[in-house]
A protein has these predicted regions:
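Conserved beta-strand hairpin/beta-sheet module of binuclear metal-dependent hydrolase folds
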Residues: 3-63, 154-157, 161-165, 258
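Metallo-beta-lactamase
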Residues: 4-8, 102-152, 196-202
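Metal-dependent phosphodiesterase/nuclease catalytic metal-binding core
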Residues: 39, 154-216, 221-251
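Active-site neighborhood of phospho(di)ester-bond hydrolases with catalytic His/Asp-centered motifs
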Residues: 48-50, 72-80, 100-103, 163-167, ...
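Short acidic active-site motifs
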Residues: 87, 286-290
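Short, charged N-terminal beta->alpha structural module
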Residues: 250-271
Length: 388
């Protein structure tokens, strides 16, 4: 059972999850996850969100420990995804006089998740920009639709200057594991929120008018120092800007010939002093990391075989992950391989036809089964283009 003080009257009552192996059924989380929840102690007591269903007992214990015999007045629900909302019914059963605070869309979702739960008059529907006074703390609710669900709202406490940011500024990893914020926050953002850059930009614009000294997300650490760094990262990610100079090479290979081409290219790039080269075998490496790095760096090389007159399934999945997250403002090079009718480059290029501001390398490497002298020259030309 872990609780900690965040502000003068704000307490963390969340939990760490080291049981989960795949977050949302797809993201590898070797360091677990945190599901964050907070209590604001005032004349009126507010609890901010709940946690995953597997941790009901631990979370309710954390809340009770902070309440120390007091009764909560409000449960504020910012986001209805089950890792944050699964214990709403358990909470209202434990505290039958509590009022649930949410917006209209949230209450609609709540009815669908908790069929048969009747809140009666214990509902407070709030509008965008509306405030709730707890005593000395005043909470203002700011709607953030599609960051990353339609009902999402964030909450600003003007007294302690705290932004309860829902899934915004979250990251993979439990709080009892120390690790770099940028990497796992980027992988979390690109994977889960990446499609909704314009909506995040709108939220950042709204947040820029607030005096924020602490950010309390629903995943990951509470942010109290150098907030400009985190906000700058979110601005870069949500505007699809290049974060760092470098080249990502993502490939799929069956008999090793396409892999050999990738190894040759990577070596040439390093010899030419390319600032950063990362290589991903899409069949074996973490797909989410390969997607993350494609958004981090400015240049991408895709290498695959022709397969059933199409492209290899892992490459198709990878490109789908990129395009559905609005991949743009990047340079792409193509390497294709085939034994009789290679057309992978054509197929891959067509997959990006709706992507904005894509620059294609002049050089495309066309391999017929294995590397030829001409292919080696093409790889050298491709390396020259990538290192410009």
């Amino acid at each position: 059972m872990v609780t900690m003080k965040v502000g003068n009257d704000i307490y963390y009552v969340g939990v760490n999850d080291h049981q989960v192996d795949l977050f949302e059924g797809q993201y590898d989380v070797p360091n677990g996850m945190s599901y964050n929840s907070y209590v604001i102690m005032d004349e009126k007591i507010a609890v901010m969100d709940t946690v995953d269903a597997h941790f009901a007992e631990e979370w309710l214990g954390n809340v009770a420990n902070v309440l120390n015999g007091a009764k909560p007045d409000y449960l504020v629900v910012q986001h209805m995804e089950p890792d944050h909302a699964a214990n709403i019914e358990n909470f209202v059963k434990a505290y039958p006089e509590v009022t649930v605070v949410a917006n209209t869309k949230t209450f609609t979702m709540m009815e669908n998740f908790f069929r048969g739960m009747d809140l009666g008059d214990r509902k407070l529907v709030v509008a965008n920009g509306e405030s709730l006074t707890l005593g000395k703390h005043v909470l203002t609710f700011v709607f953030a639709p599609m960051v990353h669900w339609p009902e999402v709202m964030v909450t600003y406490d003007s007294t302690d200057k705290v932004l309860f940011s829902a899934d915004g500024f979250g990251k993979f990893g439990a709080l009892d594991v120390e690790e770099d914020w940028d990497c796992e926050a980027r992988r979390y953002y690109i994977g889960i929120v990446g499609k909704y850059g314009p909506q995040v930009q709108k939220l950042l614009k709204a947040a820029s008018t607030l005096d924020i000294q602490t950010i309390c997300p629903l995943h990951g650490p509470i942010l109290t120092e150098n907030l400009g760094h985190y906000i700058e990262k979110y601005d870069i990610w949500s505007s699809y800007k290049v974060e760092d100079e470098g080249v990502v090479i993502a490939y799929s290979s069956v008999y090793g010939n396409t892999k050999k081409a990738v190894e040759v290219l990577a070596q040439k790039l390093e010899e030419k002093g390319c600032p950063k080269v990362t290589v991903f075998d899409l069949a074996r490496d973490d797909m989410a990391e390969a997607v993350e790095d494609a958004f981090r760096y400015g240049k991408l090389v895709l290498a695959t075989i022709t397969y059933n007159a199409d492209i290899f399934p892992f490459m198709k999945t990878y490109i789908d992950h990129l395009t559905e997250r609005n991949y743009q403002n990047r340079t792409i090079g193509l390497i294709e391989n085939g034994s009789w009718a290679p057309n992978a480059a054509k197929v891959m290029k067509a997959e990006f036809e709706k992507s904005k501001n894509i620059t294609w390398l002049d050089t495309t490497v066309k391999i017929m089964s294995s590397l030829s002298d001409e292919n080696m020259e093409q790889l050298d030309q491709m390396a020259e283009e990538l290192c410009k």
